[in-house]
Amino acid sequence: MRKGAEFEELAVKYLEGIGYKVIHRNYHCRVGEIDIIALDGGTVVFVEVKGGKTTDFGDPAERVDRKKMERLLRCIEHYLHKYPLEDYRLDAIVIRNGEIEHIKGVELY
């Protein structure tokens, strides 16, 4: 199983459990990927998933650096060029020691 797939599966189950409809998993473009794309009512939500079984090596949320955010933004732009949308947002799901934190409306710097 690919690194991170276990956490993405937990995130999908969580999102579906709160009523989101997952429409893409691991959406690839030439510069990177978007972990999950889902619908929250009429809003398309791009979801970045980070997880860790422990926090012994730091918090999973701290693994998103500027370069990762730039690649993610370019992938979102690629998706929006292919599928023009007006109502969308970026969320993050951080899984620490099996606990899920859902951060809605993450700002891209």
Task: Give the residues covered by each predicted segment.
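Acidic-basic catalytic patches of nuclease active cores, encompassing PD-(D/E)XK
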Residues: 1-25
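Acidic active-site catalytic centers that drive phospho-/nucleotidyl reactions
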Residues: 8, 33-35, 48-50, 68, ...
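Active-site metal-binding core of divalent-cation-utilizing nuclease and nuclease-like domains
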Residues: 21-44, 108
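Structural motif
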Residues: 31, 44-46, 87, 100
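Conserved catalytic cores of phosphodiester-cleaving nucleases, focusing on short active-site segments
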Residues: 36-56, 72
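Mg2+/Mn2+-dependent nuclease catalytic core
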Residues: 54-76, 82
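Domain-level recognition of nuclease-like catalytic cores that cleave nucleotide substrates
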Residues: 82-109
